[in-house]
């Protein structure tokens, strides 16, 4: 059981945004999408989440064509945190997080409450539970939305392969909370068997927390593999136009440290 994309191509008007992109997201693994601005990362995530239809190629989730599944069924298999979640209603934080239970009508109120408290705790926002969402800072709202998708993933029946897609989930966060979010996503993959796809700009954080990396440039895959295979000086020069030294991390065995120069 996997989330698999094969030879995806996407056009916007007369411009091709993605060209024959393939990837596999496995339950229990964390895959990082890297690339310069405009490389096609968010477009690829939109295709994988069912939001955007590719002009060619196909996507399967747990062996079934994604396009054959109703949106309600898709919501039981994957949760998506967009780059800029929009919410203009004056809801309480618990109400926002509780939206993660919407695909699971069979849950009892007690189950929903327990899952909500767990997600608030995992996202480190239990102290915000009594606040109104619109009163929060941008970073606090981002972490509350992270709690929502955590709840959606964990509300699924035990043993069902499921996936979490995160589009720049740490963009508005300070360093401590960036690490907290990525650690939580990593733990969710390891402990709950969720397949996690995350778009991150920081190559060092991606090397630390992701099992695999997929590097995009101008809508095409440059490299796909373990961090040590992907984060090479040649690949970084091609994708970002910078020189870089790639060294063994001095404190994290088996992890790379990338120094841009």
From Swiss-Prot:
What does the record give as EC number? 7.6.2.-
What is the topology of this protein in the membrane according to its UniProt annotation?
Peripheral membrane protein
* Subcellular location per the Swiss-Prot or TrEMBL entry: Cell inner membrane
Q: For binding ATP, which residues are annotated in this chain's numbering?
A: 35-42
In this record, what's one Pfam family? ABC_tran
Of the GO CC terms on this record, one is: plasma membrane
- Would the keyword Nucleotide-binding be found if you checked this record's keyword annotation? yes
Report the InterPro entries cross-referenced here. Answer: AAA+_ATPase (IPR003593), ABC_transporter-like_ATP-bd (IPR003439), ABC_transporter-like_CS (IPR017871), P-loop_NTPase (IPR027417)
SMART domains, alphabetically? AAA
Q: Which CDD domains does UniProt cross-reference here?
A: ABC_Iron-Siderophores_B12_Hemin
Q: Which UniProt keywords apply?
A: ATP-binding, Cell inner membrane, Cell membrane, Membrane, Nucleotide-binding, Translocase, Transport
Q: Where is the ABC transporter domain?
A: 3-243
Q: Name one GO molecular function term.
A: ATP hydrolysis activity
As for family, the record states: Belongs to the ABC transporter superfamily. Heme (hemin) importer (TC 3.A.1.14.5) family.
How does this polypeptide assemble, per the annotation? Answer: The complex is composed of two ATP-binding proteins (HmuV), two transmembrane proteins (HmuU) and a solute-binding protein (HmuT).
- What function does this protein fulfil? Part of the ABC transporter complex HmuTUV involved in hemin import. Responsible for energy coupling to the transport system.
Return the PANTHER family for the record.
HEMIN IMPORT ATP-BINDING PROTEIN HMUV (PTHR42794:SF1)
Q: What is this protein called?
A: Hemin import ATP-binding protein HmuV
Please report the organism this UniProt entry assigns to the protein: Bordetella avium (strain 197N)
